[in-house]
């Protein structure tokens, strides 16, 4: 994917040029206190969301998959209502809410399912549920 990461000592890091910060834990409970602190002190300036049960992401307030989808469509002849979106993490809420049709994966973070109870669940990532859904939708064999 070309994604690069760097582990840094935040006490020595200036923060300039940082697009996103990931906090990863073995146990999801280890992130709760950090999440509470970040939301209390930076919730008005940052998007704080889980991309996986054990991965907390922090980025600019105006950054989300929903914003990215809307930006992508700006110069194309499609609207958000024309889009289908699939999600499995809390960082998918905005995108799923904006798309014309959103689907939640069976293996999705329970917090995503709670945030989007109206969306249909389509199956597991490991079972290629997205590919199977699209193949059926478009008549591909």
Say what each PLM segment does.
Residues 57-141:
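Mg2+-dependent phosphoryl-transfer enzymes with acidic/Ser/Thr/Gly-rich catalytic loops
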